[in-house]
């Protein structure tokens, strides 16, 4: 086992864990300030460029970086590191189970979001565990499963740009079209297919408070699992995604 605290936010609020979970991943875990009551878990899945063994890579962009830049989120943030290859849903669940066993977690509020390789991981994880994932957001990715009938149970928002040269927008199209062909269609799906958006642009969504507010609108206690209304994601809105963030302050507590 190896763990250390990050510099940049208070000690013990962000800790890296290595070799902690058998058949799992090394991971960062951010702990919110108030932990006397059960808190949601937000799982962030990174893209291929952050794969490896250097765990500080995972802090380069995404939800952990957003927290370090001042975005306060009233939830545990779980950010595993993939050493390489596709994300494995079973390994992710092993890590999540460790968090649930060792912290006060609200199991009705488990959220996952990721981009590129992490977008694939998000789709595959939600497809595998639709009864565990409360809501999900997948950016510029796709999916590796053959069937998506279980995915239609999950409130899901997919974002992909038509100018993506790393992962073709057709990969998201395949998932969306497969979901729509399932019995009952895809009533819990939002799909933003954005003209002219590049591969890297959706990374800015991780820094928007609206991203987490949208996730927190969902809870497994809602038997209908109604999908919350969208907020606006466009090339224009993403340009101002960092407008209220600073690495030197914490602002805008987002409550579940």
Residue map of PLM features:
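A domain-start/cap signature at the N-terminus of enzymes
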Residues: 7-41, 75, 120, 125-128, ...
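Gly/Ser-rich "nucleophile elbow"/oxyanion-hole loop immediately N-terminal to the catalytic nucleophile
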Residues: 34-37, 86-116
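Short beta-strand/loop motif that positions the catalytic acidic residue
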Residues: 152, 157-160, 164
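Active-site machinery of serine-nucleophile hydrolases
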Residues: 39-41, 45-92
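Active-site-adjacent alpha-helix of alpha/beta-hydrolase-fold enzymes
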Residues: 63, 162-190
């Amino acid at each position: 086992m190896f763990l250390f605290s990050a510099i940049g936010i208070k000690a013990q609020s962000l800790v890296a864990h290595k070799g902690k979970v058998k058949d799992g991943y090394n991971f960062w875990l951010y702990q919110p300030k108030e932990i006397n009551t059960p808190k949601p878990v937000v799982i962030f899945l990174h893209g291929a460029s952050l794969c490896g063994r250097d765990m500080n890579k995972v802090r380069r962009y995404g939800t952990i970086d957003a927290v370090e830049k001042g975005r306060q989120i009233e939830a545990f943030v779980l950010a595993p590191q993939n050493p390489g290859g596709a994300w494995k849903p079973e390994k992710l669940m092993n890590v999540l189970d460790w968090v649930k066993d060792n912290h006060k977690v609200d199991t009705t509020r488990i959220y996952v979001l990721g981009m590129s390789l992490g977008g694939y991981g998000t789709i595959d994880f939600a497809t595998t565990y639709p009864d565990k994932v409360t809501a999900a957001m997948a950016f510029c990715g796709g999916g590796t499963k053959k069937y998506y009938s279980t995915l239609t149970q999950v409130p899901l928002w997919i974002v992909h740009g038509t100018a993506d040269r790393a992962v073709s927008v057709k990969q998201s199209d395949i998932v969306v079209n497969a979901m729509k062909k399932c019995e009952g269609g895809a009533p819990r799906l939002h799909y933003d297919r954005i003209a002219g958006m590049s591969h890297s642009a959706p990374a800015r969504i991780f820094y928007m408070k609206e991203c987490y507010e949208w996730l927190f609108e969902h809870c497994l206690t809602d038997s209908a699992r109604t999908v919350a209304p969208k907020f606006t994601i466009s090339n224009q809105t993403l340009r101002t995604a960092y407008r209220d963030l600073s690495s030197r302050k914490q602002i805008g507590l987002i409550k579940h």
